[in-house]
Amino acid sequence: SAMIQGLKDRKYDIAFCSMMDNEPLIDFVPVAKQELVLIVPKGHPLEGRSSIDLKDTLAYPHIAFSKRSGLRHVIDKLFKKCGGYPQIAYSMEEDQGVAGLVGAGFGIAVVPKMPVLSYMPVSIIEIEKPSWERLFYMATLKNVYQAPAIMDFKKYVMDHANL
């Protein structure tokens, strides 16, 4: 992702992101959990469900996160667990953009549960299967000097991690 590249290029000292595979130069420390949910437009056949198995969504067009998003990798793994991949109608990088396309009726989507969803014309459905856990990580470049202010901030984040 752009954030990980920014760490490697020393543009950033710290990034908050999803875990990325094959990044041996980056130290990932879990700092928070986030729930993922399925959102569907009002009037969708799945609208009345309180929870769902993701394999029951495969027949419907999905709005996906772009491949540059760390979240796309996480969601693709969920679909791999349920044995299939949905048809991707559109892909976007921003979660609110994905939710906006769902609200406009362009498809359904797996997104982070976020307060803004309650103000959008979508129905939120808990994902029952497959089981999963999404963690946010504090990412830093390994084996480089970090100023005392950076070390203090890292300690503060770890002391207040929401796990």
PLM features: what roles do these ranges have?
Residues 23-36, 40-62, 147-148:
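Flexible hinge/capping segments at coil-to-helix
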Residues 18-19, 85-94:
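Short beta-strand-to-loop elements that line the ligand-binding cleft
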Residues 41, 48, 65-66, 88, ...:
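Thr-Gly-centered strand-to-loop micro-motif
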Residues 1-40, 98, 102-106, 121-126:
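Short beta-strand-centered segments that line the small-molecule binding cleft or hinge
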Residues 19-20, 42, 112-115:
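Short secondary-structure boundary segments
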Residues 47, 61-82, 146-154:
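Secondary-structure junction motif
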Residues 124-163:
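A late-sequence structural motif
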Residues 37-39, 45, 108, 135-139:
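Residues embedded in well-ordered beta-strands
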